[in-house]
């Protein structure tokens, strides 16, 4: 009888302990109303670029604000698998979905309307990525960036720094990459005109967002032909430019984030002269704050670019000043350039498709199309 009594007592104590533990978890300050999930597009969260910047921004915000966070990677690069990964997150109770990349437009069209209580924060998804008659539902926010401005800054800075033989290696000819590249060649040519310098620009798309032996071999020929610096624009494709640059003491321009940390550490000190950045993490943090903390979620497609002529760090497109290494084109010169762009003293053309721009008609550009 005593044995039965003590067994029942132990069971009751165990139930009590579990209940207390559960209660503690419920009261530990973690947000009970929202859970955030990020789904990636073509790449993964170690690309040292677009996906990683978005992931790190979302994860850091959620940890700071005690909001549960997870990351979902589609099993393949297809609309069906992006939809499946998104729906899986929703089924698991995640009600704020962060989506980096224009490829999520079909997923939004398929999933958002069916889940009105879920908020979707999409980066690089523009009106042109949706079907022509699609109306943005009230639970979707999209951010697009003026990458042409960041590209212009990088190209202008490179030529002012003294580089005369340049290259642009885009990942795929998607809208953001096209804007980066189009701005880059405009900036290069503007600086060349101001300094009365003759320049040459090789321009191509890898047709993928990762580097490999084939792309590296092409970069070997570029640097071997005298190219001094390549703007490597598109996920992990920068690795091919860096591998080739190592062999000739060549230089690279990073993209999306300040890539000097990874490039200079992994490949060669001083290889990365600057990076054409956009505020991916800042956008995610701002929208998560509005959605979860302030209850001010706004459904719209918002274009983000320069918001200040003087507060450089607040701009959504910029060059990094904390790791500045250029000596002929100084931070003060950069501030002057930003002021002129902000005040529209300089205008930069934009495009969303490679078909919109005849690169062969742009001075000093040798357009090579797709490398694969």
Locate each region found by the language model:
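Prokaryotic Sec-type signal peptides and long signal-anchor helices
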Residues: 9-10, 188
């Amino acid at each position: 009888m005593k044995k039965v009594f003590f067994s029942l007592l132990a069971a009751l104590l165990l139930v009590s302990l579990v209940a207390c533990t559960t209660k503690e978890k419920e009261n530990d300050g973690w947000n009970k109303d929202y859970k955030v999930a990020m789904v990636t597009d073509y790449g993964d969260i170690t690309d040292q670029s677009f996906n990683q910047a978005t992931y790190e921004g979302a994860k850091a915000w959620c940890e700071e604000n005690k909001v549960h966070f997870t990351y979902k990677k589609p099993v393949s690069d297809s609309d069906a698998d992006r939809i499946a990964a998104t729906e899986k997150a929703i089924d698991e109770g995640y009600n704020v979905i962060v989506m980096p990349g224009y490829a999520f437009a079909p997923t939004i069209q398929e999933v958002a309307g069916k889940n009105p209580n879920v908020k979707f924060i999409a980066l690089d998804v523009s009106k042109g990525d949706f079907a022509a008659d699609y109306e943005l539902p009230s639970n979707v926010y999209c951010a697009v960036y003026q990458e042409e401005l960041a590209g212009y800054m990088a190209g202008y800075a490179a030529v002012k720094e003294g580089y005369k033989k340049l290259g642009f290696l885009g990942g795929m000819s998607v809208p953001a990459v096209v804007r980066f590249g189009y701005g880059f060649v405009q900036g290069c040519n503007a600086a060349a005109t101001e300094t009365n310098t003759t320049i040459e620009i090789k321009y191509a798309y890898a047709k993928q967002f990762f580097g490999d032996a084939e792309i590296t071999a092409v970069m070997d020929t570029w640097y071997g032909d005298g190219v001094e610096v390549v703007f490597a624009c598109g996920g992990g494709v920068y690795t091919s430019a860096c591998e080739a640059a190592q062999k000739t003491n060549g230089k690279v321009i990073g993209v999306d984030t300040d890539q000097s940390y990874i490039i200079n550490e992994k490949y060669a000190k001083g290889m990365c002269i600057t990076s054409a950045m956009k505020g991916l993490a800042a956008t995610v943090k701002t929208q998560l704050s509005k959605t979860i903390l302030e209850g001010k979620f706004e459904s719209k497609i918002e274009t983000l670019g320069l918001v200040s002529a003087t507060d450089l760090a607040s701009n959504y497109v910029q060059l990094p000043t904390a790791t500045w290494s250029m000596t002929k084109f100084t931070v003060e010169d950069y501030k002057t350039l930003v002021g002129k762009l902000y005040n529209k003293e300089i205008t930069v053309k934009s495009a969303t498709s490679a078909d919109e721009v005849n690169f062969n008609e742009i001075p000093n550009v040798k357009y090579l199309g797709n490398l694969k």
